[in-house]
Swiss-Prot record:
Positions of the UniProt region annotated as Disordered: 384-408, 536-568
Pfam families in UniProt: Tyrosinase, Tyrosinase_C
One example of a Gene Ontology biological process annotation: melanin biosynthetic process
Record's protein name: Polyphenol oxidase 1
Species this protein is from: Agaricus bisporus
Lineage: Eukaryota, Fungi, Dikarya, Basidiomycota, Agaricomycotina
């Protein structure tokens, strides 16, 4: 039997569009909705079905497309499907994952376009140019209604008529949850759920809570993303939430990615790696993760996949197996006999897609690309500064048109000038301690009595979310992440600067933290260690982004408190 190959997309290099712009493009959105419906309807035992592709990440516990390892699955390996979480392969393994879904949807879109009786040539062109959209949560933490709240959407069908149809982006409906062998609570839910209002059989999406949680996380998400671009310079620190040697002062791409999973899922599917891809928002999320990888790589163009280990193993990688840029990225077949490897996946253009920030750039001029992308990162995610203007991408068509509007100068932007101190909380823990996803919530000021209010509290500085399979294990997996603090201080206090003599007393007096399980209950985390660090930084008028110096650890701020720094 031949394999389903992950192949470069046809139609030339086309940009993936941000979902807020994508839903305004009638042809692209109409084809996407119909193609997704067709993929959902594909029999579950077929490799190109949504059920099979989503199941690659974890459940059901079956091989995908005959991709098996060189040895039998080891009992010491904790089943995680094929995905390479906690590994230096995390960014590169997920690139063909989004691509295979995009490839299948593209095929459906082209077949659908051929059935249009009105303006067929335009629909066929739109289908050829179709690329999967991404959700830029670092700029727009709350997705558009077409993704999270509209049970029906209006599309143009092949007869040229506007028609209201069920919205496939809201949820995926299982033929039978028994087909996946899921554990509770997923074995009693017929559809995927986001921030469900209970764990019972009749649980429903809680859209209002989803919006509130995501909105309250916006400032922290934006800042964490910006810091990742500016401070993370090596592949081990960039690629994985597993602590790497040499120390880091900012979140990895995987750590930020974890935050989105738990914020969207709550106690629902997106919060559990074993079932997360069944929620269609997973691929909007991971398309953006892929975009951030492309942007970071354009800035750090001399850095790519470095050696590491497979952590707890996968269906084809043994426990702690050494991995590098030549490791097979199973189950993604490049040919009938070979898998894709990380060193073959560096260029998105070679795979048939790009992102709006790269449109019109000469990708062979790496220094020029570096400067342009650095500037765009500052415009998209950096605090607005005097004289700087924000980038607005107008992607109503398949080509990027850039316009500019005056930027509002935020209070954070006013304080980040010249020499300044950038404050963060370093969060360490054993991700497997409690057997489910959880959130370490950092507060300045009073903490609400009701744990359900923690993630929407105005006193929440930010949170570090652990994205964990809901099964207990004795394996210890230390994880590290960071919660930026400056943006909260700027917007909620009257401090004139981030100077040590001003900020340190504020943190020593008012800083508190709590642990919230995915099911909404509070917990104690014995492995938790919260340490405050200050990164001396400098922002000049001739550079778009600040330069950082070695961090200073203020261990005394949290030492002696439960979950605080263990060293004095």
């Amino acid at each position: 039997m031949s394999h389903l190959l992950v192949s470069p997309l046809g139609g030339g290099v086309q940009p993936r569009l941000e979902i807020n712009n994508f839903v305004k493009n009638d042809r692209q959105f109409s084809l996407y909705v119909q193609a997704l419906d067709r993929m959902y309807a594909t029999p579950q035992n077929e490799t190109a079905s949504y059920f099979q592709v989503a199941g690659v990440h974890g459940y059901p516990l079956i091989p995908f497309d005959d991709a098996v390892g060189p040895t039998e699955f080891s009992p010491f390996d904790q089943w995680t499907g094929y995905c390479t979480h906690g590994s230096t392969l995390f960014p590169t393994w997920h690139r063909p994952y989004v691509l295979i879904l995009e490839q299948i949807l593209s095929g459906h879109a082209q077949q659908i376009a051929d059935t249009y009786t009105v303006n067929k040539s335009e629909w066929k062109k739109a289908a050829t140019e179709f690329r999967h959209p991404y959700w830029d949560w670092a700029s727009n933490s709350v997705p558009p209604p077409e993704v999270i709240s509209l049970p029906k959407v209006t599309i143009t069908t092949p007869n040229g008529q506007k028609t209201s149809v069920a919205n496939p982006l809201m949820r995926y409906t299982f033929n039978s949850v028994n087909d996946g062998g899921f554990y509770g609570p997923y074995n009693q839910w017929d559809t995927t759920l986001r921030q469900p209002d209970s764990t019972g059989v009749n649980a429903k999406d809680n859209v209002n809570r989803l919006k509130s949680v995501l909105k309250n996380a916006q400032a922290s998400l934006t800042r964490a993303t910006y810091d990742m671009f500016n401070r993370v310079t090596t592949w081990p620190h960039f690629s994985s939430h597993t602590p790497a040697s040499g120390g880091s002062t900012s979140n990895s791409i995987e750590a930020i990615h974890d935050n989105i999973h738990v914020l969207v899922g709550g106690n629902g599917h997106m919060s559990d790696p074993s079932v997360a891809p069944f929620d269609p928002i997973f691929f909007l999320h991971h398309a953006n993760v892929d975009r951030l990888i492309a942007l970071w790589s354009a800035i750090r163009y001399d850095v790519w996949t470095s050696p590491g280990d497979a952590q707890f193993g996968t269906y084809t990688l043994r426990y702690k197996q050494s991995v590098d840029e030549s490791t097979d990225l199973a189950p993604w077949w490049k040919t009938q006999n070979e898998y894709w490897k990380s060193n073959e996946l560096r260029s998105t253009e070679s795979l048939g897609y790009t992102y709006p920030e790269f449109v019109g750039l000469d990708m062979y001029n790496k220094d020029a690309v570096n400067k342009t992308i650095s500037r765009k990162v500052a415009q998209l995610y950096g605090p607005q500064r005097g004289g700087q203007r924000s980038l607005v991408e107008d992607l109503s068509n398949s080509h990027a048109r850039r316009s500019q509007r005056p930027a509002k100068r935020s209070r954070l932007g006013q304080l980040l000038k010249g020499l300044f101190s950038d404050w963060s909380a370093q969060i360490k823990f054993n991700r497997h301690e409690v057997g489910q996803s959880f959130s370490v919530c950092l507060f300045l000021g009073n903490v609400p009595e009701d744990p359900r209010e923690w993630l929407v509290s105005p006193n929440l500085v930010g949170a570090r979310h652990a994205f964990v399979r809901s099964v207990k294990t004795d394996h210890v997996a230390e994880e590290i992440g960071f919660i930026p603090i400056n943006q909260w201080i700027a917007e909620h206090t009257g401090l004139p600067s981030f100077a040590v003599d001003l900020v340190k007393p504020l943190l020593a007096q008012g800083l508190q933290w709590r642990v919230l399980l995915a099911d909404g209950t509070p917990a104690e985390l014995d492995s938790l260690e919260v340490t405050i660090l200050e990164v001396p930084s400098e922002l000049t008028d001739d550079e778009p982004n600040p330069r950082s110096r070695p961090p200073r650890y203020h261990k005394d701020i949290t030492h002696g408190k439960r979950g605080g720094c263990r060293e004095a």
